[in-house]
Amino acid sequence: MATNNSYLLKNALFGNSAFSFISGLAAVLFSKAIANFLGLSASWIIFALGIGLILYGIEIFIAAKAEPVHKGIATFAVYADLAWVLGSAMLIFANLVDFTTAGKWAIAIVADIVLVFAILQFVGLRRLKNQA
């Protein structure tokens, strides 16, 4: 299946894909409840975010499924995940949005999970680069 010691990268991408897709699906199906939990009045923001996460999850899945793994999309995933983490921190600490305390914790926990995926994908890419 995986060649070039790409097991870590592929597994990280598959995990990221599943997490993103499932989170996106939940955001689309339960946008009003999630918005209320976070303290947002505009549930369309959660709905739109969900659509984006579904598309992102599909793209990352395609990259992971490719043989060999698509390094360009994997690199994009690392940067996109880091942007998500940075954006989450800004949302939590800048207080531009009046999130509930539970909402801030949820954002932080999701950001932690996304950061783990970014790190695993980065290490997987480095292993491929060092092998060449």
Identify the function of each model-found stretch:
Residues 31-41, 94-102:
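Membrane-interface helix termini and inter-helical loops of multi-pass transporters
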